[in-house]
Amino acid sequence: AGEYGTLPKERVSEEFMKWAVKSIRPGRLLGYLTETSWIAHFPEIQKLAGVPQDPTWHPEGDVGTHTMHVVDAAAHIAIREQLGADARAVLLFASLAHDFGKPATTELREREGKMRWTSWGHEPLGGPIARQFLTRIGIKSSIVDQVVPMVENHLTHHNTGTEVSRRAVRRLAMRLAPASIEQLVLLIEADASGRPPRPSELPAEAGRIL
């Protein structure tokens, strides 16, 4: 941890960009940071570990485990879609940060007659946390400005009915700018694919906003 403090900000951002653009198994990040004790310098990531989730929806475990599966899925999607360096970085950082709001919002609530773990409101809360984190590690603003609205809207598809109006799609596009709906759908796919043993798939609701 002491060695980290001697690194210039440019080196930190360079290493994170390398992780986002080139890593085949980016999900190893949490384990690596924990083993090196550098995790203490990234509380936004550190706080994800141990945060419980409803096992009905998240059989893979806590938020930290889920996030590492999501970034691995995002890397596969980026390769499949042949994304350029910046587009891949946006997807990977959005995947890493998408649940940054969960540690502060997770609590037991009664749902359908049972006590379940919920994290209502974690999406809008996560946006500013993602911006703070990415800015602190030196990621350029053109990437940060796309990641933040993706984090804040990554559950939008759950709020749509069977029919989505053009007006609703236009409003979503405005909320996402400068990111795009197409980018958001890739994040939604990565998020849904980060819940093993559930199958990797794009939720049907997400297809309706395209």
What are these regions (language model features)?
Residues 1, 132-136, 193-210:
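Charged substrate- and nucleic-acid-binding regions of tRNA-handling and nucleotidyl-transfer enzymes
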Residues 1-88, 92, 100-121, 125-142, ...:
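Glycine- and charge-enriched loop/helix tracts that form the active or gating conduit
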Residues 17, 51-60, 82-83, 139-201:
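Histidine/acidic-rich helix-loop-helix segments that form or flank divalent-metal centers
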Residues 64, 120, 178, 200-203, ...:
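Short, well-ordered coil↔helix boundary/capping segments
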Residues 98-99, 191:
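Acidic active-site catalytic centers that drive phospho-/nucleotidyl reactions
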Residues 113-114, 170-171, 206-207:
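Short, low-complexity, polar/charged sequence segments that are solvent-exposed and flexible
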